[in-house]
Amino acid sequence: DVLGVTVEGKDLALYEVEGEIYATDDLCTHGAARMSDGYLEGREIECPLHQGRFDVCTGRALCAPVTENIKTYAVKIENLRVMIDLS
């Protein structure tokens, strides 16, 4: 599952992969597309605009046309709340 959220003015995409939550910037590094509108398969998110893919756990760009990694954020669950480190 993928969910777009805004935290302290920053647009993020949250992903559930094998019971863990991961977070990246919501904007693709290649084009103006929201990753939260993309297709998640395993730990890879496919950009809905040009079909480039990223590893949501590491942010690594996996295939053309994306060449720049996407920023990831540390996530932890506390008292059933998702806590994201924006630093």
From Swiss-Prot:
Cofactor binding, per record: Binds 1 [2Fe-2S] cluster per subunit.
InterPro entries in the record: Rieske_2Fe-2S, Rieske_2Fe-2S_sf
Gene3D superfamilies tied to this protein: Rieske [2Fe-2S] iron-sulphur domain (2.102.10.10)
GO terms, molecular function: 2 iron, 2 sulfur cluster binding; metal ion binding
Stretches assigned to the Rieske domain: 1-84
Cofactor (UniProt): [2Fe-2S] cluster
GO BP terms in the entry: catabolic process
Pfam families: Rieske
UniProt entry keywords in alphabetical sequence: 2Fe-2S, Aromatic hydrocarbons catabolism, Electron transport, Iron, Iron-sulfur, Metal-binding, Plasmid, Transport
Pathway linked to the protein: Aromatic compound metabolism; naphthalene degradation
Binding-site list for [2Fe-2S] cluster: C28, H30, C47, H50
Subunit structure: The naphthalene dioxygenase (NDO) multicomponent enzyme system is composed of an electron transfer component and a dioxygenase component (iron sulfur protein (ISP)). The electron transfer component is composed of a ferredoxin reductase (NdoR) and a ferredoxin (NdoA), and the dioxygenase component is formed of a heterohexamer (trimer of heterodimers) of three large alpha subunits (NdoB) and three small beta subunits (NdoC).
Function description: Component of the naphthalene dioxygenase (NDO) multicomponent enzyme system which catalyzes the incorporation of both atoms of molecular oxygen into naphthalene to form cis-(1R,2S)-dihydroxy-1,2-dihydronaphthalene. Functions as an intermediate electron transfer protein via a specific interaction with iron sulfur protein components (ISP) (NdoB and NdoC).
Family stated for the protein in its record: Belongs to the bacterial ring-hydroxylating dioxygenase ferredoxin component family.
Name this protein carries in UniProt: Naphthalene 1,2-dioxygenase system, ferredoxin component
Organism: Pseudomonas fluorescens
